[in-house]
Amino acid sequence: MSTKETVIDLFDRLFMEDVSDMMDEDLFDAGVLDSLGTVELIVEIESIFNIKVPISEFGREDWNTANKIIQGIEELQHA
């Protein structure tokens, strides 16, 4: 499964939201993510992708869309 497919599946599983049609939409403004959801998401991302997401890297503006989350994961995988 690609990173994109995994992230879409993760949002569906954690938040019961299909983000496949809103890949560039701000997930905080859309009500998909909040502070608690962000923590849940980070924990799952770290587990699934076997990476460490430094809190300093997870700024709202840097990870506020599904595409930015995918990009961030891929950057951390290749760091």
UniProtKB/Swiss-Prot annotation:
UniProt domain Carrier: residue ranges: 1-77
Sites of O-(pantetheine 4'-phosphoryl)serine modification: S35
Entry's transmembrane regions: none
Gene3D superfamilies in UniProt: ACP-like
Record flagged with keyword Nucleotidyltransferase: no
UniProt-annotated location(s): Cytoplasm
Pathway membership, UniProt: Cell wall biogenesis; lipoteichoic acid biosynthesis
Gene Ontology CC terms, in alphabetical order: cytoplasm
Post-translational modification: 4'-phosphopantetheine is transferred from CoA to a specific serine of apo-DCP.
Keywords: Cell wall biogenesis/degradation, Cytoplasm, Phosphopantetheine, Phosphoprotein
InterPro entries xref list: ACP-like_sf, DltC, PP-bd_ACP
Gene Ontology MF annotations: D-alanyl carrier activity
Main location: cytoplasm
GO terms of biological process kind: cell wall organization; lipoteichoic acid biosynthetic process
Functional description taken from the UniProt entry: Carrier protein involved in the D-alanylation of lipoteichoic acid (LTA). The loading of thioester-linked D-alanine onto DltC is catalyzed by D-alanine--D-alanyl carrier protein ligase DltA. The DltC-carried D-alanyl group is further transferred to cell membrane phosphatidylglycerol (PG) by forming an ester bond, probably catalyzed by DltD. D-alanylation of LTA plays an important role in modulating the properties of the cell wall in Gram-positive bacteria, influencing the net charge of the cell wall.
Family of the protein in this entry: Belongs to the DltC family.
UniProt name for this protein: D-alanyl carrier protein
Organism of provenance: Streptococcus equi subsp. zooepidemicus (strain MGCS10565)
Gene: dltC
